[in-house]
């Protein structure tokens, strides 16, 4: 199809699709000939998605499926549009934050409970399997490659360098598929990470210098931590991705900064409580529904922010 604001041909080309054929019917020639491992993995993913749908109502179930499993198109079209306008579509995409939690948990368990080689294998395999489980989109692949490089460097007794890991991930991905360079998700993922690695520390140093002028180091440290966690991280990512948003989509969200500042602090509790409720629901649905009441208010809060800010007529500049 020819769309006014989206180059669908370029989108398909970035995924290795050169032509699209449509036939009048499909004839099934065989079954069970694919990868048993991947088939099992995707069945588990579908089972978890079904469990989320059983323990939570919509649209909260759709939001949790996006946050935990990276399942797209699980929300009504108008709510999807509100997420885009509010600059919060990224929370529905598995990214470096999810990968870092998985890698951190594996590192913690591996170092304390297992010997060197078993722990290293567990960490590397765990990150790779999780990346396959949620789907190898550009942000997931970028985050997984960086995590594998950081884990490998730590177990080799070498200091990891985030900017070097980012450059290495970019090299590996573009060497494997040069068309990634034209992918909006690839550009946004690397731009946001670059903002967090380069822009946020520079902004933080300037803020610390200003706060220290107040004469109270302890108070300055408290305000610095709060500002970094709530504002600077969001601001750095937004500034870094602004050129990509403008060139790719021809617009920028004015609501993105306040929306992210309001929503990002509750993402970790949502992931942890949501994962626990889903695991319990997988064992026994009524137990999962009880546990889901802990995460439902947080999901409802996120949706309220999206509906409020995403519904403003002045939320974007085109």
What is the predicted function of each stretch?
Residues 16, 43, 47, 62, ...:
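Generic alpha-helical secondary structure signal
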Residues 56-60, 160-161, 199, 204, ...:
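Proline-centered turn/helix-capping motifs that create local helix->coil transitions or kinks
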Residues 28-40, 85, 219, 246-262, ...:
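Membrane-interface amphipathic/re-entrant loop segments adjacent to transmembrane helices
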């Amino acid at each position: 199809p020819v769309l006014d604001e989206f180059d669908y041909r370029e989108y398909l080309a970035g995924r290795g699709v050169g032509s699209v054929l449509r036939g009048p019917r499909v004839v099934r020639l065989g079954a069970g000939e694919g990868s048993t491992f991947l088939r099992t993995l995707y069945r588990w993913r579908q089972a978890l998605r079904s469990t989320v749908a059983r323990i939570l109502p919509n649209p909260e179930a759709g939001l949790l499926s996006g946050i935990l499993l990276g399942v797209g198109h699980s929300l009504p079209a108008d709510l999807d549009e509100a997420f885009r306008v509010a600059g919060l579509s990224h929370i529905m995409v598995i990214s470096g934050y999810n990968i870092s939690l998985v890698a951190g948990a594996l590192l913690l368990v591996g170092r304390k409970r297992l010997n060197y080689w078993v722990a290293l294998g567990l960490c590397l395999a765990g990150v790779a399997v999780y990346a396959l489980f949620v789907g190898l989109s550009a942000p997931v692949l970028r985050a997984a490659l960086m995590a594998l490089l950081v884990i490998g460097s730590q177990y080799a007794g070498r200091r990891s360098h985030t900017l070097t890991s980012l450059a290495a991930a970019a090299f590996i991905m573009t060497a494997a598929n040069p068309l990634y360079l034209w992918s909006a998700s690839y550009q946004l993922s690397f731009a946001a990470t670059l903002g967090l690695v380069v822009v946020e520390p520079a902004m933080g140093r300037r803020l610390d210098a200003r706060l220290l002028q107040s004469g109270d180091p302890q108070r300055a440290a408290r305000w610095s931590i709060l500002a970094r966690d709530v504002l600077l991280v969001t601001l750095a990512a937004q500034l870094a991705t602004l050129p990509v948003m403008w060139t790719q989509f021809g617009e920028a969200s004015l609501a993105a900064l306040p929306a992210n500042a309001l929503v990002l602090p509750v993402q970790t509790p949502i992931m942890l409580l949501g994962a626990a409720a889903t695991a319990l629901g997988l064992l026994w649905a009524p137990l999962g529904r009880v546990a889901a009441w802990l995460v439902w208010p947080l999901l409802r809060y996120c949706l309220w922010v999206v509906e409020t800010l995403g519904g403003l007529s002045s939320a974007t500049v085109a």
